[in-house]
Amino acid sequence: MGHKIHPKSIRLGYIKDWESKWFNLKEMPNFIEEDYRIRVYLKNRLKLASVSKIVIERPGKYLRVSIYTARPGIVIGKGGQGIESLRKEIETMTAKKTFVNIMEIKRPEIDAQLASENIAFQLEKQIAFRRVMKRTIEKAMMSGVQGIKVMVSGRLGGAEIARTEWLKEGRIPLQTFRADIDYGFSEACTPMGHIGVKVWIFKKEFFKKTAKELAEDAKVVVDLDTAAKQG
């Protein structure tokens, strides 16, 4: 089933975290719809800013929106005017006091969502799909990832019949929960129809601490407690 389930959702609570960080059973339907509208609005508003993900938190009656982008200058704007404008627009949508944080993605070539959007952008410019896929894989592997897989589906190259093509390099252990696999999906709107783009990037594995490391951590905690009592 590893090939069928979403690579991020299966790892939530293990090595991945939620992108909507709140819990309210009574208002859950309204909050889910509101989060969706905020994300759609920001993705359309910041098309040129290379936005990878948007994390929404709801501490109390406030709203905290964190925008992860590879081009923070476009979002912030001159003298912070861009971010202030975004804050006011979100407050108008939600009627809640809003805080906006900008998080910079320093290595966009290993971000699966940004990689898929870049492929879709180049496909819309009629660049050969195999060349685009190879370039994306080369850049990611040169950045030190352990594996990458790129898949495109649709009327590739203007063909009459839609088909699926994919390229892969390195390992993509989808069924290994400790594997940090990033996943991204985008669509290219071409004159011949839509082309779907999927990207999987295997960055590293998370291993549990050994008994020796856990014992050392416990010793540090005990030493800190002792020092606090003596102080």
Swiss-Prot record:
Biological processes per GO annotation: translation
Domain KH type-2, first and last residues per copy: 38-106
Q: What's in the keyword line of the UniProt record?
A: Ribonucleoprotein, Ribosomal protein, RNA-binding, rRNA-binding
Q: What Gene Ontology molecular-function terms does this entry list?
A: mRNA binding; rRNA binding; structural constituent of ribosome
What InterPro entries has UniProt attached to this entry? KH_dom (IPR004087), KH_dom-like_a/b (IPR015946), KH_dom_type_2 (IPR004044), KH_sf_prok-type (IPR009019), Ribosomal_S3_C_sf (IPR036419), Ribosomal_uS3_bac-typ (IPR005704), Ribosomal_uS3_C (IPR001351), Ribosomal_uS3_CS (IPR018280)
Q: Does the keyword RNA-binding apply?
A: yes
List, alphabetically, the Gene3D superfamilies matched. 3.30.300.20, Ribosomal protein S3, C-terminal domain
GO CC annotation terms, alphabetical: cytosolic small ribosomal subunit
Recorded coiled-coil stretches:
none
Q: Which NCBIfam families match?
A: rpsC_bact
Write out the similarity annotation: Belongs to the universal ribosomal protein uS3 family.
Q: How does it assemble?
A: Part of the 30S ribosomal subunit. Forms a tight complex with proteins S10 and S14.
Q: What does this protein do?
A: Binds the lower part of the 30S subunit head. Binds mRNA in the 70S ribosome, positioning it for translation.
Q: What is the protein name stated in its UniProt record?
A: Small ribosomal subunit protein uS3
